[in-house]
Every structure is written in C-alpha cells, then in structure tokens.
Swiss-Prot record:
Annotated function: Acts as a chemorepulsive guidance molecule critical for axon fasciculation and for determining both the initial direction and subsequent pathfinding events of the Ti axon projection.
Name of the protein: Semaphorin-2A
Region (Disordered): 673-697
Family, per entry: Belongs to the semaphorin family.
Gene for this chain: SEMA-2A
Organism for this UniProt entry: Schistocerca gregaria (Desert locust)
Length: 697
C-alpha cells in the first residue's frame, strides 16, 4: 500500500512543466530608469558614445559603455508640453495623453544636431537641438521647425515612423520623411515629406508631399513600423487593412511602400501628392498547399551596409497568437515593384492584375528627374493603381524562425564571422523582443547545400512583464539595449561565462566556445569547442557529467542532468537509454510503476533490482547530456525471498508507524499542558514588572 502511494506521488510530481527562463547574471546587465517615463524611442550614435532615448517630456542621453552611469537630470533635455488645458478639454487624460511623448529622434547632417518631434499634448511639435541636448542659439534659426503635424503622431499610443534624409531630395535639400496620423481624429494617415528649405537663405524651395487624402487604395488605417533611406528611394514598412481582400471580409496585410526622393508631385494632377507612390504585400508564411500566414508586421530592422531587411510578424492578435521572423532582400522588393499592377474594375469586382498593354509609358512609379513633366495618363494611373499584384517573398521560402503563443514586438540583427578549424563560418544572430519582456536569440546559417538553417539558442528576460518597446544593438560596444515603459536595460552580447555552465549550450552560441582545459565557457577564439550547426555529435562528450552510483536493492533513485531545464531545450526530445551486459542497449519507456520522467526531463527508477544495474545515458538528439553508471548492492539489503518475508517487513513497518503516532499524541498532550501553565503564570503580576496598571482616581 505504501509503495503504491509513493508511486502515485511520484507520478503527480512528474507532470510536465514548461522549461524555465534562467535569469541573466547581474554582471551582464546595466540599467537606467527615472520612473514610469514611457521609454519608446531610440537613436544610437556610436561616434558620440550615446544612446538617445525619447520619453515622457524628456530626451535622455545615455552612456553607451554603461547606461547606469547616466544621470536623470544632468543627461536629459526637458521639453514640456504646451496648451495642456486645451488637450484636457477634449477629453484626454492630463497624466498621459496631454504630456509630450517624444516619438522621433533623428540625426541631421554629421549628427551634431538632432531633429526631435513629440506629441505635445495632442498638438505635435518639433525641435532642432545640439547633440549634447542644448538648444540652438537664437541666430541659428532652422526654417520649417515648430509645428510637428504629419511628422509625429497626436496620440502617444499611435505607431509612427520617420527618417531624416540628407541627400537625393529635390535640390539636394535635407528633409524629414514620416508615416503617421495627421489629424486629431485619426481620420488622415499619411506618408509625408516636409517642405524643403534652403538652410542658408531660409527660403522654401519645394512644398511638402503626401499620400492622397482619405483614399483607402493608398492607405487604409496603417500602423507604421519603420522607414529607410535606400539609394534613390525611401521605403516604408507598415501593416494595414487589406483593400484587395475587403470583399471577402476584413484582413490585415503587411506592406512595403516606396517613393522616389526626387518626387515633386505632378503639375496639375497630384500636385501636392506623391507621383511615384507604390506599395506591395510582404509575404511571411509557412509554406504548403495552404500556407499559414503571419500577416501583421510588428517591427523591422535593416542591417547596416547590406540590402537586407528583417521583420517580426504575427498572426492576428484576436486569434491564436503566433510570431515569425522573416527576411527580405532589396532585390526581391524591387522586382515586385517592377512587376504587374493590381486593380479592381468595380466595387464588387475581384482584384486582378493589370494587363501589361494597359500600363502607360514611362512606367508609373519609376524615378525621373522631374515628376511635373510626367503625362496625365501616368499620373492618373498611379492615382488609381498604387498596389502591386505580386507579394514580396521572404528569403528561403520560409520563416527564419516561428513560435506559437509568443508575440514578437521588436527585432535587431547581428552578423558574425567565425574561423572554425580553418573554415570561415558566417552566422546571423536575431534578437526578437516580446510582449512579455523577453528576448528570443536565434542563430541562422547556411548548410553545405546553401539552404538556410536556424536554431533557437537562448531566451532571457529583459523587461518582464512589460513589452519590449524599443530595441537596438551596438557591435562596437557589444551590447543590446532594450526599453519598456519603466526601464532601459543594457545587456552584453557576449555572455558566455555568466550564462552557460555546460558544453552543449555553450557550443551552440556563436559568440562562445567551450574550453576543455578549464571546463568553462569563454568568448570564442580559435581552439575552443564550438558546434552551432549541431553536426559534431561527440564534440562535448569529454565534458559530459558522468557519475557512478551504488544503490541498495529496493531503493528508488533520481537521475538528472539539469536542476532546471533551459526553456530553449524544454520543447526538444530528451530521451534516456539503458545499457546492460545481458540486454545491450535499449531505450527507456516510461511507466508509472518503474520509470518516471520528471518535470526537468530527469529519470526516476522505482524499486531497483539487479536487472537495473548498468549505464544510463541521457540524449538530446545526437548529443549526450549526462551519464550514470548504476551498481545495485544486493549484500547490504538482500531481496526478500518469500511472501512471508514481505508480510513480516510490512507488519514491522506498520508497528513502527503506530508507535510513532502514539509518541506524537503524547508529545502534543504534554505541549498543551505546558501552554496552559504558561498562560496562568502570565496573568499574575510579577514584582519586577516595569510597567503596571495604576489608574488615577
């Protein structure tokens, strides 16, 4: 009976739990916070060793080496909102909506000046300041600065994007490109370029350009996530209601839009609007006969000095949650913009590709020296046909990585080149922030056949439980910078020694290598063990924990490789194998009366006998995690030979248990008597009492 009860308890304890996220070592983290300030905008300037953070009524300048050394007052610029009363009178909250949330920080020229735009109590306003966060001198007036409408949002909760472009604009004059809401009511969303001024004379040379107002074919309730200056174009990434799907129901698609930097609009048609605006769908999906789409882009990153764009996408937040990382090339994007256009003949018609014979010349959307010279046929076509028929395919035809029950919010990417046994390996490392304040670290490489492969290397907390609102990476300072509404954290990219205690995990991190001499994880240098691609099954075998145990007959024992299984390994198949002289090698099949799997993928052996002797190996795929050599000592506790022996042992156990119960009751009775005497004693006045009752008549 007791044995059955013990087995049931073990079974209950073996219920599978989700793998744990191991906390980062404190030496890997620096942090900065001045309270609940909504830190949502980053601009990183390695030249000035600074991370600029846009927050509530403030811009902070943090030390890139160690953000903890920064001071809330000394290293900040205060930009108080104006006309708060008017904002409150419109039904907005004084403590959040009617503050000045800084949403744009962009370098101007060589970076010695910064362009800043904030919500300013639902009345957007912009500034130009020095990079040391001091205001310009009075004589350094910058024309066109002061009103931030269409440059950053009214509502601090609205998504927006902006990029300052120095070169390639009309007259080669600098200006801001933005994607945001341009009205208090949010009815007018816009992709916008500011008026272009000659900064020497202060004269306006070119008027602003924008998307067509209130036209769902151009923009339909977009959420902007990024914008980039790329050659003769500016690219915008966003998600919006899919106008081409509206007849079948409401759905959201991810988009990339393109405008030419030299665009000055049309002469009579589209005179204030873009004459080169095009947009296309971004395809991030799991391939198959019926592809599974991650339709909603949440964040985008362009790796410096490359033509690659990396995005995090999610399923609809109203359904089952899932997220994916997909990559796109500029070449694939441009090919779609050079392809067929899409149109809807009538409001009830299906959206179909436009026949090539109906596309005017010069081709709509192509960059020309002067868009005012474009014929009306081209301008009318672009006005009614901004959408391309094809979708931009993701690299490799599949996501880099995808995961259910996770919402990715931000993404940054690093590239590593490693000399591995005379062979140069290139790894792309993705850091994806989540809505619960974690970062997923994924590594990608190309196999010998040129096919992309990826592996989840680590998961760690950065801002739990709050979402990661901003994320940036510095190769020079070897740090990852993440922000939530409450805190900014800096995490070292190379976290080997403080992160991995075993060879298996260490060897899978492209920044790290296992030192067999010191039996520790170090920053990778040639000669250390590394196996990111998981092709060397026996690489870590010499470092595997191997133990010898001598157990007595009838004893139950626990074999395990981890105190806590890292979450990155929790979803992988971990198996146990038993080696004996008689049976050879055979896999352990779990059953409640003999072999029980623990929540950390350990193994419990119930009531061992001679046949349980031998070696027990724990495997993760083709990698050995740990090994135990078990010897059953039958001399110290021999097996009962007959049923009478079992009955005698059981009877002895029952008598012992009964004696223990009697002893416990005796102790409880005496304890109660002592308590009663103590209470009676405390009620009497002691002659040495310092305080006593002495009522005054």
């Amino acid at each position: 009976m007791a044995a059955k009860l013990w087995n049931l308890l073990l079974v209950a304890a073996s219920v599978h739990l989700v793998g744990s996220v191991e906390q980062l070592h404190q030496d890997l983290i620096h942090e900065f916070s001045c309270g609940h300030k909504y830190y949502r905008t980053f601009h990183l300037d390695e030249k000035r060793e600074s991370l600029y953070v846009g927050a509530l009524d403030k811009v902070y300048k943090l030390n890139l080496t160690n953000i903890s050394l920064s001071d809330c007052e000394r290293d900040s610029l205060t930009l108080e909102p104006t006309n708060i009363a008017n904002c409150v009178s419109k039904g907005k909250s004084a403590d959040f909506d009617c503050k000045n949330h800084i949403r744009v920080i962009q370098p101007m020229g060589d970076g010695s000046r910064l362009y800043i735009c904030g919500t300013n109590a639902h009345s957007p306003k912009d500034w130009v300041v020095y990079s040391n966060l001091t205001h310009l001198q009075r004589h350094e007036y910058v024309p066109g600065i002061g009103v931030g409408i269409a440059k950053c949002p009214f509502d601090p909760e609205d998504s927006s994007t902006a990029v300052w472009v120095e070169n390639g604009n009309p007259g080669d004059l600098p200006g801001l490109y933005s994607g945001t809401n341009a009205e208090f009511t949010k009815a007018d969303t816009v992709i916008f370029r500011t008026d272009l001024y000659n900064l020497t004379t202060g004269r306006r040379e070119y008027s602003f350009k924008r998307t067509l107002k209130y036209d769902s074919k151009w923009l339909d309730n977009p959420n902007f996530v990024g914008s980039f200056d790329v050659g003769e174009y500016v690219l915008f990434f966003f998600r919006e209601t899919a106008v081409e799907y509206i007849n079948c129901g409401k759905s959201v698609y991810s988009r990339v839009a393109r405008v030419c930097k030299k665009d000055v609009g049309g002469k009579n048609i589209l005179s204030q609007n873009w004459a080169t605006f095009l947009k296309a769908r971004l395809n991030c999906s799991i391939p198959g006969e019926f592809p599974f789409y991650f339709n909603e882009i949440q964040g985008v990153y362009k790796m410096p000095n490359t033509d690659k764009f990396f995005g995090v996408f999610s399923t609809s937040v109203t359904g089952l949650t899932g997220s994916a990382i997909c990559s796109f090339t500029l070449k694939d994007i441009q090919e779609v913009f050079s392809g067929k256009f899409k149109e809807q003949a009538t409001s009830s018609s299906a959206w179909l590709p436009v026949l090539p014979s109906r596309v005017p010349d010069p081709r709509p959307g192509e960059c020309v020296n002067d868009t005012e010279l474009l014929p009306d046929t081209v301008l009318n076509f672009i006005r009614s046909h901004p959408l391309m028929d094809g979708a931009v395919s993701h690299e490799g035809g599949k996501p880099v990585f995808y995961k259910r029950d996770v919402l990715f919010t931000q993404l940054v990417v690093d590239k590593l080149k490693v000399n591995l046994v005379g062979k140069n390996m290139e790894y792309i490392v993705y850091y994806a922030g989540t809505s619960t304040g974690q970062v997923y670290k994924v590594v990608q490489w190309y196999d010998s056949g040129g096919l992309p492969q990826s592996l989840l290397v680590d998961i760690f907390d950065v801002t739990p439980p709050e979402p990661v609102q901003a994320l940036h990476l510095s190769k020079e300072y070897k740090s990852l910078y993440a922000a939530s509404d409450n805190i900014v954290r800096q995490i070292e990219l190379v976290m080997c020694h403080h992160r991995y205690s075993n060879c298996l995990q260490c060897a899978r991190d492209p920044y790290c290598g296992w030192d067999r001499d010191s039996n520790s994880c170090k920053s990778y240098t040639p000669g250390l063990l590394q196996d990111v691609t998981n092709t060397s099954a026996n690489l870590c075998e010499h470092s595997v924990m191997k133990k010898k145990l001598i157990v007595t007959w009838g004893q139950s024992i626990h074999l395990g490789c981890f105190l806590k299984v890292p979450e990155v390994l929790s979803s992988q198949t971990i198996s146990w194998v038993h080696y004996t002289k008689d049976k050879g090698r055979y896999p352990i099949v779990y059953r409640p009366d003999k072999y029980i799997e623990t929540s950390e993928h350990g193994l419990v052996l119930i009531s061992v006998t001679d046949s349980d002797s031998g070696r027990y190996d724990c495997w993760l795929g083709g990698s050995l995690l740990c090994s135990y050599n078990i010897t059953v000592d039958a001399h110290r506790c021999s097996a009962p030979g007959r049923s009478n022996d079992y009955q005698k042992i059981y009877s002895d156990w029952c008598h012992e248990f009964e004696r223990s119960k009697i002893a416990m009751k005796t102790w409880e009775r005496k304890q109660a008597q002592c308590s009663t005497k103590q209470n009676n004693s405390n009620q009497k006045t002691h002659p040495n009492d310092i305080f006593h009752s002495n009522p005054v008549a």
